[in-house]
């Protein structure tokens, strides 16, 4: 094109430019303007979308005359004092006197589970009830969280408060009778020191438009291929020459009249070139374009200068050949210089082509003029030619002519092979000149018609090239998009009907193992009773009938410019992502930038480096020291020192070179701007980074990541490169990818994670590496329900099992057939692993779906050591599975296992009444699957069975109407789009701040003495379900166990180490009113929801409850109760959540302080048995207190006066 432009300029200066020159320049300018318009389409910005502003209703405090004004009764006289007012000293005096009267009242005897006889009461007629509370103080001043009161005064909460505040008339105490006091478990309330939450909404969330790095499709950079001489014989040449002279061309034996319209546009110039299927016939992208007949006469001086330039070029080519021989590098283009000589010689001798005219002298470089739609200049005469695949710029070029072994690359063999090839009957690989009226009639859209399961559909994709194509002379000329051009040259268009054979049943002819001619059965060529392939004319009687599914052949139309890279699931099979700049497409926008290297700052940046076409840099910076780094530096030095050859590669070749570990070739391909994220169906959507990780090449992984490879790309099995490194046991590659940001918790299609594979192969360092990130779930289950510890048990990796147990692996999780890891350990016969699991409190009597215990499996497999271990740990050999077999029935007679089971049976009969008891599991899950984790029940103290005198529930229930305000429109909610970690979260503001850290634990500064109210995000919030402010509503996450204590009946203990601030469980039971609590007989499970007098509500876990009903009192508690609101915000009905107040060891009993109000009533019947040094309610502590009071009784002057008592903090 540059030569054509120079010749045109010279002719115009002399005033002798022919008419064709003016048309040439005009057409070039028109095409350049069209290309600029198309190029600018990719840079058109998107319209910015913003979401409407959503502002919640602000909190309006209730006015003085509001009907929801809350008053709290202080004292026994029923005087109402507004909330927040400080009670008078006189009221406190009356309260103290009232408490003193209770000790002498008549007490109704309840059925407390943990009871001991006490001294007889002093008489009286006032019944009492024991209720647990949130604090240890007998009474606390009426205080409440100021923000919560504003919530209560909202219009939605007013009705519920008014409706629920009326006490039932049936339970009203008559006048003159003292108020009934009940012993309740209570908790402390937040004081007035908690600052009110400002009534404001979070600021408007700014929606920033993410600027996509859009790379529009670049113009095609390669020129038309150099013509090659046909050595198929003189007959063919003479025939074509005569056809050219006569102006008529006959391609088939059909009617030549169908070519009349085309011949009118084409003119006299016509040449036909047939391209072989070898890789070596691709043409260099820097080959010079030819412009024929720009002028008929040139001066002799110009011809002499042209001959001198040709001689200089020949000398340069000879120098390049010598350099190639010295370097010894073998490439696909080793015979390129020889072929260039042959082409030049042929170009001079051939009578078909007029001699080309070059510029007189070389001019300084100018700005490139815009090319036509097809990437070549619009000048020159129109010709009908079949061009090589390389010049068509097709994305599937590499699949048409692969480089097969044994194919010679030198020119002589190519000419010999070309001589034996026959001219095909079809014209699938021929290009006709541009016909403007055809493209304009089609609206510059693709004219292809696809045949899909017998149905026809058209393609409306935009075209890049206006040259026309057709499969045969029986089909009209049409302009095609790049996708259908690629399929046309692959002979996938039927020559009979002109439809593309996309999906359905077709015939395929294979004249060569590399080529498949596809056509319809009804479109075969018939002659003298024989059928022939309409493509090649071969006998079609042996053509294969193939059925192509819809997913394989249907390819979406290729657009001219893509706004953003498509997702991986929508990639066209076997095609590169053309929306990004590649080796043969240049984007008009900003080039892609590789991700920054996080290790670059820690390693010396000195060393060789290469700059990629996309702006990235290849260097050894960030690569750990070792052989891999040395090899990479050596490869970079070689690329810097040697003269780089201009080669052409298919994107799929990068994967193959990476798989073979060819570092030099990989760098060369990356320098040719091959896409490091290219995925093909032939490799199951695997990227080159997958292949590098599979091979274990750290240096290739390094250069691919520097070139912009996606470290978390997934293949068809959803496997990432990090998973490939773990599966293939490449520790260094895995460590490097973890440091570079590889996702360690992603899951495959079957649910397996990297930790599953590491545990399966037994690489302890790999497991330690993954666990050290803190991002993997040690109890993750795959599609079969198997956890990493189950895989390790099955493959006998005992050290991996020990490490997983130290990191919190749950040995009670079951797979899809309800097997636990102990079942798999017994299946493999590893007694050592089984003992480790049993020491980790694994259930020896667990049964799977078939009713088999680990003993059944070990006996069936005849593993003697496992059977002895299970029998020594108390396994019951008399248990039967679902088929009615015991372990003894499954054992071969007279075997070692059979004798062991027989001996154990006799020993069990002999020691049936032994004095020492061993702890045994009497229930595998008291929650019956209602909790996230199973809660087993064990008893090693007596023969008491698992308690069944209650109904296990996981949430509070009601047996009467409570009028709880659950209206979703009354909920205060946040509009966060993140994980609610910012200070703008409204739910966090309601709680003063969000009190949870990233692990869902309470912060260190949380007030454990007077816990504030916590408002978690609810169903009205805009945040995700897994946001940071949703802890209690996620349920129990720690492993607990119900066990029989020696002195306090049933208790609850931890089966794992629990850090401080961790959510344990919720106190769940039946919601009842205070009046209802006064008439209930058993008050051992009452928990007061508020710490003030008046109409309050309680939770009774006597008949309905969860595991928390078994938590005992501890004077030195390790858990604390906190009021939490989730599904509603009715302040009368908070939910009681228990959090750990300190670190809890494995096997330690859980307990909280019931409160002094509880022990004021219950201390007359039993005393505390916690055994703590700080115990305040044991028999010894009570005796010491009574002795102290007795000594002070004769000296009343030593007692402090009420007026001198310090005021109670509010």
Swiss-Prot record:
Zn(2+) 4 binds at residues 1115, 1168, 1170, 1175. It holds the Pfam family Ank_2. Zn(2+) 2 binds at residues 974, 987, 1017, 1021. InterPro entries: Ankyrin_rpt, Ankyrin_rpt-contain_sf, EHMT1/EHMT2, EHMT_CRR, Pre-SET_dom, SET_dom, SET_dom_sf, SET_EHMT2. Residues 1038-1155 form the SET domain. ANK repeats lie at residues 649-678, 684-713, 717-746, 750-780, 784-813, 817-846, 850-879. Keywords: Acetylation, ANK repeat, Chromatin regulator, Chromosome, Isopeptide bond, Metal-binding, Methylation, Methyltransferase, Nucleus, Phosphoprotein, Repeat, S-adenosyl-L-methionine, Transferase, Ubl conjugation, Zinc. Residues 1074-1093, 1154-1157 are annotated as: Interaction with histone H3. Zn(2+) 3 binds at residues 980, 1017, 1023, 1027. It is found in: Nucleus; Chromosome. Residues 1-262, 280-386, 548-608 are annotated as: Disordered. Residues 972-1035 form the Pre-SET domain. Residues 338-347 have a biased composition (Basic residues). Changing residue 786 to A: Abolishes binding to histone H3K9me without affecting the histone methyltransferase activity. Residues 26-38, 198-216, 280-291 have a biased composition (Basic and acidic residues). The modification N6,N6,N6-trimethyllysine is found at residue 185. S-adenosyl-L-methionine binds at residues 1048-1050, 1085, 1112-1113, 1169. Residues 298-327 have a biased composition (Acidic residues). GO terms for cellular component: chromatin; nuclear speck; nucleoplasm; nucleus. The modification N6,N6-dimethyllysine is found at residue 185. Belongs to the class V-like SAM-binding methyltransferase superfamily. Histone-lysine methyltransferase family. Suvar3-9 subfamily. The SET domain mediates interaction with WIZ. Heterodimer; heterodimerizes with EHMT1/GLP. Interacts with GFI1B and WIZ. Part of the E2F6.com-1 complex in G0 phase composed of E2F6, MGA, MAX, TFDP1, CBX3, BAT8, EHMT1, RING1, RNF2, MBLR, L3MBTL2 and YAF2. Part of a complex composed of TRIM28, HDAC1, HDAC2 and EHMT2. Interacts with UHRF1. Interacts with CDYL. Interacts with REST only in the presence of CDYL. Part of a complex containing at least CDYL, REST, WIZ, SETB1, EHMT1 and EHMT2. Interacts with PRDM9 and CDYL; interaction only takes place when PRDM9 is bound to hotspot DNA. Interacts with SMYD5. This is Histone-lysine N-methyltransferase EHMT2. It comes from Homo sapiens (Human). The lineage of its organism: Eukaryota, Metazoa, Chordata, Craniata, Vertebrata.
């Amino acid at each position: 094109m540059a030569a054509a432009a120079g010749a045109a300029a010279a002719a115009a200066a002399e005033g002798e430019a022919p008419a064709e020159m003016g048309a040439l320049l005009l057409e070039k300018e028109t095409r350049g303007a069209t290309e600029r318009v198309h190029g600018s389409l990719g840079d058109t910005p998107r319209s910015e979308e913003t979401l409407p502003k959503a502002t919640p209703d602000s909190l309006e405090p209730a006015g003085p005359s509001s009907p929801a004004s809350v008053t709290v009764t202080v004292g026994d006289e029923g005087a109402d004092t507004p909330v927040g007012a400080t009670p008078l000293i006189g009221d406190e005096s009356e309260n103290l006197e009232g408490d003193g009267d209770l000790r002498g009242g008549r007490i109704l005897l309840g059925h407390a589970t943990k009871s001991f006889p006490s001294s007889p009461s002093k008489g009286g007629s006032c019944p009492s009830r024991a209720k647990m509370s949130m604090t240890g103080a007998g009474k606390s001043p009426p205080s409440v969280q100021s923000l919560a009161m504003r919530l209560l005064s909202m219009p939605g909460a007013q009705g519920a408060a008014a409706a629920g505040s009326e006490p039932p008339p049936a339970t009203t105490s008559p006048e003159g009778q003292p108020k009934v006091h009940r012993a309740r478990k209570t908790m402390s309330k937040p004081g007035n020191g908690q600052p009110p939450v400002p009534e404001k909404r979070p600021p408007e969330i700014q929606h920033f438009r993410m600027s996509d790095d859009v790379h529009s499709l670049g113009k095609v950079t390669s020129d038309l291929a150099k013509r090659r001489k046909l050595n198929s014989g003189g007959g063919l040449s003479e025939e074509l020459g005569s056809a050219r002279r006569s102006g008529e061309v006959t391609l088939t034996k059909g009617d030549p009249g169908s070519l009349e319209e085309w011949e009118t546009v084409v003119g006299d110039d016509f040449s036909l070139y047939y391209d072989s299927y070898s890789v070596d016939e691709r043409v260099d992208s820097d080959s010079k374009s030819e412009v024929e007949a720009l002028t008929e006469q040139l001066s002799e001086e110009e011809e002499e200068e042209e001959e001198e330039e040709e001689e200089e070029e020949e000398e340069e080519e000879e120098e390049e050949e010598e350099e190639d021989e010295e370097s010894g590098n073998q490439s696909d283009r080793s015979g390129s210089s020889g072929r260039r000589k042959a082409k030049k010689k042929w170009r001079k001798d051939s009578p078909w082509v007029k001699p080309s005219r070059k510029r007189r002298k070389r001019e300084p470089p100018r700005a490139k003029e815009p090319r036509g739609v097809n990437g070549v200049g619009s000048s020159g005469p129109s010709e009908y030619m079949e061009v090589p695949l390389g010049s068509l710029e097709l994305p599937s070029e590499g699949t048409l002519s692969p480089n097969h072994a044994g194919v010679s690359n030198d020119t002589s063999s190519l000419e010999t092979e070309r001589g034996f090839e026959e001219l095909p009957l079809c014209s699938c690989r021929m290009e006709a000149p541009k016909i403007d009226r055809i493209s304009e009639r089609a609206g510059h859209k693709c004219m292809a018609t696809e045949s899909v399961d017998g149905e026809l559909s058209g393609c409306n994709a935009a075209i890049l090239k206006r040259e026309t194509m057709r499969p045969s002379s029986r089909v009209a000329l049409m302009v095609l998009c790049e996708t259908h051009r690629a399929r046309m040259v692959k002979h996938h268009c039927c020559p009979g009907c002109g439809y593309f054979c996309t999906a359905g049943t077709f015939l395929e002819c294979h004249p060569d193992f590399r080529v498949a001619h596809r056509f319809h059965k009804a479109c075969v060529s018939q002659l003298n009773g024989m059928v022939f392939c309409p493509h090649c004319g071969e006998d079609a009687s042996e053509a294969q009938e193939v059925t192509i599914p819809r997913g394989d052949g249907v390819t979406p139309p290729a657009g001219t410019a893509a706004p953003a890279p498509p997702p991986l699931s929508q990639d066209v099979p076997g095609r590169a992502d053309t929306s990004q700049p590649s080796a043969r497409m240049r984007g008009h926008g900003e080039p892609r930038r590789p991700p920054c290297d996080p290790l670059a700052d820690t390693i010396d940046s000195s060393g060789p480096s290469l700059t990629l076409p996309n702006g990235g840099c290849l260097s050894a910076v960030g690569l750990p020291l070792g052989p891999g780094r040395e090899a990479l530096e050596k490869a970079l030095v070689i690329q810097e020192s040697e003269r780089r050859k201009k080669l052409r590669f298919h994107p799929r070749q990068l994967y193959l070179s990476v798989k073979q570990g060819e570092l030099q070739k990989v760098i060369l391909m990356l320098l040719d701007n091959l896409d490091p994220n290219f995925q093909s169906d032939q490799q199951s959507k695997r990227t080159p980074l997958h292949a590098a990780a599979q091979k274990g090449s750290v240096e290739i992984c390094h250069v691919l990541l520097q070139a912009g490879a996606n470290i978390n790309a997934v293949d068809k099995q959803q496997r990432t490169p990090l998973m490939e490194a773990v599966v293939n046991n490449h520790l260094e590659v895995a460590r490097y990818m973890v440091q570079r940001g590889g996702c360690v918790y992603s899951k495959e299609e079957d649910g397996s994670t990297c930790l599953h594979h590491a545990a399966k192969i037994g690489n302890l360092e790999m497991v330690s590496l993954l666990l050290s990130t803190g991002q993997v779930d040690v109890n993750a289950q795959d599609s079969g329900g198997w956890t990493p510890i189950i895989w390790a048990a099955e493959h006998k990796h005992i050290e991996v099992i020990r490490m997983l147990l130290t990191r919190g692996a749950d040995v009670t999780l079951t797979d899809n057939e309800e097997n636990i890891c102990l079942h798999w350990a017994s299946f493999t016969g590893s007694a050592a692993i089984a003992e480790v699991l049993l020491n980790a409190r694994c259930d020896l009597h667990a049964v799977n779906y078939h009713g088999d215990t680990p003993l059944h499996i070990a006996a069936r497999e005849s593993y003697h050591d496992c059977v002895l271990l299970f029998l020594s740990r108390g396994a019951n050999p008399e248990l039967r599975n679902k088929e009615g077999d015991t372990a003894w029935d499954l054992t071969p007679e007279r075997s070692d296992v059979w004798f062991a089971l027989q001996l154990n049976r006799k020993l069990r009969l002999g020691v049936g009444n032994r004095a020492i008891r061993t702890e045994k599991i009497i229930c595998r899950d008291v929650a019956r699957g209602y909790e996230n984790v199973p809660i087993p029940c064990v008893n090693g103290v007596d023969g008491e069975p698992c308690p069944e005198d209650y109904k296990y529930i996981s949430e509070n229930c009601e047996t009467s109407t409570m009028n709880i305000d659950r209206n979703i429109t009354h909920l205060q909610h946040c509009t966060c789009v993140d994980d609610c970690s910012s200070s703008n979260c409204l739910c966090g503001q309601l709680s003063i701040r969000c009190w949870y850290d990233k692990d869902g634990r309470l912060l260190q500064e949380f007030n454990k003495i007077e816990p504030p109210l916590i408002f978690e995000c609810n169903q009205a919030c805009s945040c995700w379900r897994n946001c940071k402010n949703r802890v209690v509503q996620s349920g129990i996450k720690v492993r607990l166990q119900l066990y029989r204590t020696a002195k306090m009946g049933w208790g609850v203990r931890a089966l794992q180490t629990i850090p401080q601030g961790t959510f344990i469980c919720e106190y769940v039971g039946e919601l009842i009113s205070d009046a209802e609590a006064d008439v209930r007989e058993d008050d051992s499970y009452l928990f007061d929801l508020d710490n003030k007098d008046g109409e309050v509500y309680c939770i009774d876990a006597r008949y309905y409850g969860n595991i928390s009903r078994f938590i005992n009192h501890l004077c030195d508690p390790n858990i604390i109760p906190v009021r939490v609101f989730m599904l509603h915000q009715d302040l009368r009905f908070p939910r009681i959540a228990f959090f750990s107040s300190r670190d809890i060891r494995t096997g330690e009993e859980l307990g909280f302080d019931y409160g002094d109000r509880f022990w004021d009533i219950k201390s007359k019947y039993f005393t505390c048995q916690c055994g703590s040094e700080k115990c305040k309610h044991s028999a010894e502590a009570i005796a010491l207190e009574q002795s102290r009071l007795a000594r002070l009784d004769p000296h009343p002057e030593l007692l402090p006066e009420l007026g001198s008592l310090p005021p109670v903090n509010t």
